[in-house]
Amino acid sequence: MAPLLRPADFPASARRHLDDAKLLEANSRLPNAGHLYGYAAECGLKALLIWHGHPTDAEGSPVHALGFRQHVDQLVITSTFKALKRFVNNRSGAKYLAMIPSISAFSDWKVGHRYFSETALPATLPRWKAAAYEVGRMLDQARMDGKK
């Protein structure tokens, strides 16, 4: 019997969401671009965790038990991000965390924004974009370092 493939591919998902966000922004679809910048960052953080040994479920997603199976706004809140930093730093991940200094920009990103009117969305797209680009560069570096 062939081994089961894990469908979750956080590095590829992060790149796909980042690329799609760029296309949406270029076509003045700013609310959806902002939403995808958040998903790109979330996937990048989860890739970082998994590369550094975080346990995964059968699909390849972070297990619930350690508190990291959340959306980006919850991953960057102080208590959760401190735990994330401790986990990754204890496994030689400080270099990658240093590459995403603006990740806290997603503290006002919400998965529920997809239901909001455009006028009710926060005006933080430029900050989300900058932070998502940092995550993209971090993923590029990790790939050059042999992370998959």
Tell me the role of every PLM-derived stretch:
Residues 1-148:
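Terminal alpha-helical segments
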